[in-house]
């Protein structure tokens, strides 16, 4: 099964400037264990607290189907989706590939109020609010 990455974006621009990149990990929980979790434990196991923050890319790697989800919010600079070595070193060596989309698909949704340019393989796509690019 192909891995899918969905990034909710205010206006993601692929550029050469380095962005703060944060990666969190969610381990799988057994359904019988989850039945006994209190609210605090449920939030610790399943909520991604930090999705959108200025000039950062925030991702969470979930062991449920090796799904990666997150957000990017360029405010003062372009953001570039780079490979995250932490993904290959800490969780799953099969995803330590030469570049982030080597063996993955990407879905981008513009959650902002304005248009957002996205640069893919040298071609610019301008997304209107609520538009998606796959």
Task: Say what each PLM segment does.
Residues 64-87, 91-122:
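Glycine- and acidic-residue-biased ligand/ion/polar-headgroup-sensing regions
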Residues 13, 29, 111-113:
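Generic recognition of cysteine residues
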Residues 20-76:
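A short, N-terminal "cap"/entry segment at the start of jelly-roll beta-barrel domains
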Residues 54-55, 64, 102-104, 128-130:
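Short beta-strand-initiation
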Residues 120-134:
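Short acidic-glycine-tyrosine-enriched beta hairpin
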Residues 8-11, 51, 59-61, 101, ...:
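A generic structural signal for short, solvent-exposed coil/turn residues
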Residues 57-58, 97-98, 131:
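A generic local secondary-structure boundary/capping motif
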């Amino acid at each position: 099964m192909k891995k899918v990455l969905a990034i909710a974006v205010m206006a993601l621009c692929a550029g050469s400037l380095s962005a703060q990149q944060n990666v969190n990990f969610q381990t799988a929980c057994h359904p019988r264990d989850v039945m006994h979790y209190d609210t605090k434990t449920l939030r610790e196991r399943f909520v991604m607290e930090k999705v959108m923050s200025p000039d950062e890319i925030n991702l969470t790697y979930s062991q449920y189907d090796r799904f990666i989800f997150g957000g990017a919010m360029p405010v003062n600079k372009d953001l570039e989706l780079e490979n995250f070595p932490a993904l290959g070193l800490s969780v799953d060596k099969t995803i330590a590939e030469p570049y982030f989309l080597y063996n993955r698909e990407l879905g981008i949704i513009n959650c902002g109020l304005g248009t957002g340019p996205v640069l893919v393989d040298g071609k610019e796509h301008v997304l209107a609010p609520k538009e998606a690019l796959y």
